[in-house]
């Protein structure tokens, strides 16, 4: 599942959930639910995250 990729990217970049949530302008608990696969992440936030981590959307959602 791609939510694992969100976690890996965050850890690889030495970021906290709060830092990513601040960038997305959302609550840390909400971001945590995205990262844990509890809540579906909106496409607009996926685009922001792809830009933030400088990766493609395909990479982010593990589409090969």
Where are these regions (language model features)?
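DNA major-groove recognition helix of helix-turn-helix
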Residues: 35, 53, 64
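A short, Lys/Arg-rich alpha-helix, primarily the initiator
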Residues: 1-12
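Alpha-helical residues within the helix-turn-helix
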Residues: 11, 22, 51
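DNA major-groove recognition helix of helix-turn-helix/homeodomain DNA-binding modules
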Residues: 44-59
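Short alpha-helical DNA-recognition segment
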Residues: 15-33
């Amino acid at each position: 599942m791609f939510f694992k990729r969100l976690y890996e990217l965050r850890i690889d970049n030495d970021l906290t959930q709060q830092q990513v949530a601040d960038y997305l302008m959302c609550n840390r608990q909400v971001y945590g639910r995205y990262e844990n696969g509890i809540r579906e992440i909106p496409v607009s936030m996926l685009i922001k995250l792809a830009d933030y981590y400088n990766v493609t959307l395909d990479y982010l959602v593990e589409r090969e």
